[in-house]
């Protein structure tokens, strides 16, 4: 297959949650390795307002990959993950479309694909990395909540990682492919 970011395509797309654990234990040069899943073509609904959005499932350590400026509330935490809580962090554009300026969205419920999620935070980050769509247009769920809501099983779309200081990402890729 064709290479994608230095990974063979087939291998990249069929990563499972168990692969993450294996990479964590075997590739010592990796500082943070965190999976993410995403879906496009959803709508975030609050009261009578709607906004086209993407939905992402992330872990708390994603903050080490792309830091989030929280204008309100907080990011996903370990308890959200463990309990697969129906909570979400909304992006800036979603906030601007659904809420009044200056309104605190935390504690309010936003409906996405028929499920209500309590807003725990609003990230004002534009998301310069653009991993799986813009942060400003995403509803972010705890990874485990997203797995359940969309029946994803152990499927992972993208693995994000950072190398320890002094290690080149290009040096890591062959190790991670094994």
What are these regions, as identified by a protein language model?
Residues 1-54, 61-64, 96-97, 147-148, ...:
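Hydrophobic, regular-secondary-structure patches
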Residues 54-56, 60-80, 84-178:
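Mid-to-C-terminal secondary-structure elements
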